[in-house]
Amino acid sequence: MSAKEKFTSLSPAEFFKRNPELAGFPNPARALYQTVRELIENSLDATDVHGILPNIKITIDLIDEARQIYKVNVVDNGIGIPPQEVPNAFGRVLYSSKYANRQTRGMYGLGVKAAVLYSQMHQDKPIEIETSPANSKRIYTFKLKIDINKNEPIIVERGSVENTRGFHGTSVAISIPGDWPKAKSRIYEYIKRTYIITPYAEFIFKDPEGNVTYYPRLTNKIPKPPQEVKPHPYGVDREEIKILINNLKRDYTIKEFLVNEFQSIGDTTADKILELAGLKPNKKVKNLTEEEITRLVETFKKYEDFRSPSADSLSVIGEDLIELGLKKIFNPDFAASITRKPKAYQGHPFIVEAGVAFGGSIPVGEEPIVLRYANKIPLIYDEKSDVIWKVVEELDWKRYGIESDQYQMVVMVHLCSTKIPYKSAGKESIAEVEDIEKEIKNALMEVARKLKQYLSEKRKEQEAKKKLLAYLKYIPEVSRSLATFLASGNKELVSKYQNEISEGLFKLISKKLDLINIEEYRKVYRVDNE
């Protein structure tokens, strides 16, 4: 006879403490990188989403060499956090301000709490927070830990001081075991790639070796922040319907519920849906049975005439900022970008942006440099398992004038959506959703056509150079002979005529060959009349 099984439950905090790799913390190197990433993302969501030009300072210090404990501190000039929310925001797993129906960098209410859990597993220093909401006269300070069994914050210390320096924003410091030598390149790459798509931000990064890197603000143009929108009927299930009903503050009929709580449903559409679902418009929504809720959701899925989800909940980077970032970091000969029109999958709106940079200071490689972004987050790890890489790899670049194994090219793709289909809670690779994959391909093909046009014009210029060089070598001889003939033996006129004829022939050849930059060729192929 077997022993009885013992059943128990785990709090969310206990679950992620036992499975840190699910949140992107499998080892010290990745943990250090992930901590930096989560804190920077929080800082950006506290700034640009609210129309504030970000000023972000990142510091990593080695505070315990024997145990390889690093202190990561990120300071921003964002909106700050209400002091009453700080303990839960940093000490309760799956507690977040990012569950609204709009685009945010964070999704799960997990990120920074996962760093706190990993920190507690290996050392005893609490997380340190300083925050001051806009126009606050106080700066609030906290030292926190997480009660793993209860999934609740433990307030080790709290206080406040007078805000004499007019500070608004948040400073977060976490002590964590790390491996800087292994994480170094990834962290630098993450900050660089973040800067590429946020050229309106200023970053200062001090690493454990004392090196300070400054990323200056290149523009004051900031993307339109995303707006919270109502759910689209395609994107809800039974449980979400029940939550919406339970949270209602008014005693709606079913029809009023559909019209007021969903996008893309007006009076006429509501009548059609209720007729198809066999529901009475005047029935109180809180009296719906389980079976009626099921019928309503099934009707949502079958109805084909909904308008597409609103894109107001999304915030794109924009073509100008993409090209500005690519040009600043890679110094290419050519850069182009495209922002596609909004599409939807499973009721969730999404937009794909793509950019390409070619030539210049970009190194030649067997593969293009691929920059992957989701909701303005650089994706550094798990590159080859991502749908973006899959599309880049499958695209026939030869068709666009790029020779295989000779890629002097950067390819950038950004996916923004109210729901990014990540493969895991670590948020490093995007799943292969058919609608998204198709749109990524369309975006890359569109920007690749711009590259093809540039390369075609460049090859045309190179061919023109060769022809011009061939013609130019005859100009001195032809101009000298014509000048001698026209001067009729007058040596003083020979030089004058020769210069005029040479210049005229040069301009004629340049015009005939349709050269783009005449002055460039005048310098390269200067006619020598001496």
UniProtKB/Swiss-Prot annotation:
Cystine crosslinks: none
InterPro entries: HATPase_C_sf, Ribosomal_Su5_D2-typ_SF, Ribosomal_uS13-like_H2TH, Ribsml_uS5_D2-typ_fold_subgr, TopoVI_B, TopoVI_B_transducer
Catalytic activity as recorded in UniProt: ATP-dependent breakage, passage and rejoining of double-stranded DNA
Keywords from the named record: ATP-binding, DNA-binding, Isomerase, Nucleotide-binding, Topoisomerase
SUPFAM superfamilies named among the record's database cross-references: ATPase domain of HSP90 chaperone/DNA topoisomerase II/histidine kinase (SSF55874), Ribosomal protein S5 domain 2-like (SSF54211), S13-like H2TH domain (SSF46946)
Positions of ATP binding: N42, D76, S97, K98, G106, M107, Y108, G109, L110, G111, V112, K113, K427
Keyword Isomerase: yes
Pfam family, one: NFACT_N
A Gene Ontology biological process term: DNA topological change
One annotated GO molecular function: ATP binding
EC number: 5.6.2.2
Leading EC class: isomerase
Family the UniProt entry places it in: Belongs to the TOP6B family.
Subunit-level organization: Homodimer. Heterotetramer of two Top6A and two Top6B chains.
Main function: Relaxes both positive and negative superturns and exhibits a strong decatenase activity.
Name the record gives this protein: Type 2 DNA topoisomerase 6 subunit B
Organism of provenance: Saccharolobus islandicus (strain Y.N.15.51 / Yellowstone #2) (Sulfolobus islandicus)
Lineage: Archaea, Thermoproteota, Thermoprotei, Sulfolobales, Sulfolobaceae
